[in-house]
């Protein structure tokens, strides 16, 4: 179930104001294998120190993304967070995605569902997607295999 996942507005805040940082050296494991690569994001409480983070509306001019379709695509910084504030970030591994029975781009790309359906099509959902260069929020069809994971 996607009920406990962040909604479209929340993933927009992470993408837009979460200081997304690609870490190509962080090691993680899945399905009995070691992999590297993933994204660090500021946690919700840390974003709230400087921004008006809300579950009801997205950052800037986006409004409620569940009602007003919006796409975000943003360049990311490189390297893990360091120093005093590093503990205020969380890590999402680049778990790849499934499509037509195959696993794609594990260690290169992360694709995570939100709890929000697309505003014009209940067969679509909002998702957070990232790679070493960009982080994006968009909608896609529910026939692809993205990950269902609470963020923090």
Regions found by a protein language model. Give the residues of each.
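An acidic, glycine-rich, mixed-charge low-complexity segment common to nucleic-acid enzymes
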Residues: 2-4, 16
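C-terminal, surface-exposed recognition/capping segments
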Residues: 10, 14-152
């Amino acid at each position: 179930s996607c009920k406990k996942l962040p909604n479209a507005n929340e993933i927009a805040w992470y993408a837009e104001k979460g200081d997304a940082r690609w870490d190509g050296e962080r090691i993680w494991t899945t399905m009995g294998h070691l992999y590297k690569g993933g994204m660090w994001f500021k946690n919700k409480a840390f974003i709230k120190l400087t921004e008006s983070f809300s579950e009801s509306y997205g950052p800037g001019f986006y409004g409620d993304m569940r009602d007003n379709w919006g796409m975000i695509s943003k360049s990311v910084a490189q390297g893990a967070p360091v120093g005093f504030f590093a503990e205020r970030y969380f890590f999402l591994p680049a778990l790849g995605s499934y499509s037509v029975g195959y696993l794609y781009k594990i260690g290169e790309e992360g694709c995570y569902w939100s709890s929000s359906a697309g505003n014009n099509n209940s067969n679509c959902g909002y998702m957070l997607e990232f790679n070493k260069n960009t982080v994006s929020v968009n909608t896609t069809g529910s026939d692809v295999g993205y990950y269902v994971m609470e963020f923090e």
